[in-house]
Amino acid sequence: MVFPVAKLKILPTDALIIVDMQNDFMPGGALPVPNALSIIPAINRYIELFEKAKAVVVATRDWHPPNHISFNTRGGPWPPHCIQNTWGAQFHKDLKLPGDTIVISKAFKEDKEAYSGFEDTELDATLRQRGVRRIFVAGVATEYCVKATAEDGLRLGYQVFILEDAVKGINSPPGSEERAINNLIDRGAVAIRIDDIVAD
């Protein structure tokens, strides 16, 4: 993995993007990511660091209509999940999101899938309005929505950091999560952990 030489200081123009930490992706949900609960403490630590720095905190969420094109009931690859205004679409109760968290809903059109937090959303415009230049990506699933969000961030000109201790993948087939992170690094992202950030 590639790590920055010097420790990073979180700035007010940085954004933490927490991807899809919703009930349906947790144990007991419709589409659980293995061990997804294990990253919640790390994500909460990052939230504290970003709040202290007066940086931006974003939480993306799948926000599907009941007959979404991705559902296997319509020939898609996934069981119905994260349906609008249901328990499964809610953020997990242990996630300590600040009151001013920017919530970005994605994949809300019945006939269009969207893995990235940037696709068909106001995320890019919102970040630019706040002067954000660096994004730090956490959440699930590494090979899908985390990867797609990071890829779009790179394409849009942001400096992208993958928070390795705060992402979790499906990892099927085995090794797919590591390949996804390595692919992002090859494209210009930087993989870091919480110890790589200055806590002051």
Where are these regions (language model features)?
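Catalytic-core segment of enzymes that process non-peptidic bonds
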Residues: 61
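Active-site-adjacent betaalpha module
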Residues: 2-17, 29, 35, 41-54, ...
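Short acidic, Gly/Ser-rich segments with clustered Asp/Glu that frequently serve as metal-coordination loops
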Residues: 22-28
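Feature marks short, surface-exposed loop/turn motifs that line or immediately flank catalytic pockets
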Residues: 25, 66-67
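Short aromatic-enriched loop/helix-cap "lid" or pocket-rim segments at secondary-structure transitions
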Residues: 69-73
